Design a protein with these regions (language model features):
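Signal-transducing coiled-coil linker helices
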Residues: 9-12, 16-27, 105-155, 162-173, ...
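PAS/PAS-like sensory domain cap-loop motif
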Residues: 34, 43-60
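Conserved hydrophobic beta-strand signature of PAS-family and PAS-like sensory domains
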Residues: 38-39
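Terminal output helix/cap of sensory domains in signal transduction proteins
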Residues: 64-103
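PAS and PAS-like sensory/regulatory domains
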Residues: 93-95, 102, 107-111, 268-273
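Conserved long alpha-helical elements within nucleotide-processing catalytic cores of c-di-GMP signaling
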Residues: 160-183, 190-217, 226-230, 234-235, ...
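A short pre-motif secondary-structure segment
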Residues: 224-227, 268
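Catalytic-core segments of nucleotide cyclases and related cyclic-nucleotide turnover enzymes
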Residues: 246, 264, 278-315
Length: 315
């Protein structure tokens, strides 16, 4: 069917047809006017972002709502805004970004922005479709299985230390038998004691959940992210080189720094220090984790909020 005939067909439908259509989609769909205020927010957008339509209609998407960032943690709302690019080019603008969920963690999405024209051919609005491509799509079943086997950290809803220990033992066996490389990232929250002292343990627990969900949402489905200790997390990354491990570590670090917990009067954010290392053939479970932890402590010594993959410097 041609575009002209399709337009004629739409003109003959009920006024709420498009709204019903968009609300039937699992993908997020929203529309902005020329001032970049949100004028429509579908049910898919509610499910993916956690924000109900009533909380976002009439607001700018940069008003501490989605706040798109790239994999380097750079906010796109000013210089790289998909809506601005679409209004200027009057064409579809696809891309990837990390949006801010209502709970404060970062979520990877594929985004496609497109112009909406009036009858005179002028762009009067911008539509955006965003698709969640995080492993959390598979999480409900996985979380139930982990909880059944007592391998789930109930406070953060990610894998617990027992699961991570079993996972690392399996990865070491695979590496030695099949030469499959993998790396470990040891993560510690910076200044967590001060945060708890200032805002209370309940807020501190929310920050830990924010970090846990950012990690779990931004690794591949065959990688593993979990809670190691009170304010420590561990990520195992499969089939990876040293350079790629450094890139993944810094991406996760930057995404955490661009996340926040929302209180009534302020937004609480934090940074993390990381140690990243590839597993070696001579490694035991203990030696691998110890080396990653020592590299994390090296990041602390260098000033925090960084990744160390060697003791000569930090990335």
């Amino acid at each position: 069917m041609s575009g002209h005939r399709f337009s004629e067909l739409l003109n003959g439908t009920k006024p709420d047809f498009l709204e019903t259509l968009f609300n039937s989609l699992e993908n997020g769909v929203y529309f902005l006017d020329r001032d970049k205020r949100i004028i429509f927010w579908n049910r898919g957008a509610e499910l993916i972002s956690g924000y109900p339509a009533a909380e976002v209609i009439g607001k700018h998407c940069s008003d501490k709502l989605l706040v798109h960032v790239d994999d380097k943690g750079i906010v796109q709302c000013k210089d790289f805004c998909p809506a601005d690019r679409t209004f200027k080019s009057e064409t579809v603008f696809p891309g990837t970004a990390y949006i801010l969920h209502k709970e404060g963690y970062r979520l990877p999405v594929n985004v496609s922005a497109f112009p909406v024209f009036d009858t005179a051919g002028r762009p009067v609005a911008c539509g955006q479709v965003f698709i969640d491509y995080s492993p959390r799509i598979l999480m409900p079943q996985n979380l139930q299985e982990l909880e059944r086997m007592s391998l789930l950290d109930l406070g953060t809803q990610v894998a617990n230390r027992q699961f991570l220990e079993l996972h690392l033992q399996s990865r070491l066996t695979e590496m030695k038998r099949f030469k499959l490389p993998f790396g470990v990232i040891f993560i510690d929250v910076d200044n967590m004691a001060k945060l708890n002292e200032r805002h209370g343990r309940e807020v501190g627990d929310r920050v830990l959940r924010m970090i846990a969900k950012t990690l779990a949402s931004n690794v591949r489905f065959f990688d593993a992210a979990g809670r190691w200790d009170r304010e420590e997390f561990l990520v195992a990354v499969l089939n990876i080189s040293e350079a790629k491990l450094d890139m993944v570590s810094n991406k996760l670090r930057l995404l955490i720094s661009q996340s926040h917990v929302s209180l009534e009067a302020e937004f609480i954010s934090c940074t993390v220090s990381m140690g990243a290392t590839l597993a070696r053939r001579e490694d035991t479970f203990e030696s691998l984790v110890t080396r990653a932890e020592q590299l994390m402590l090296h990041s602390k010594w260098l000033g925090r909020n960084r990744v160390s993959s060697s003791f000569k410097g930090a990335k």
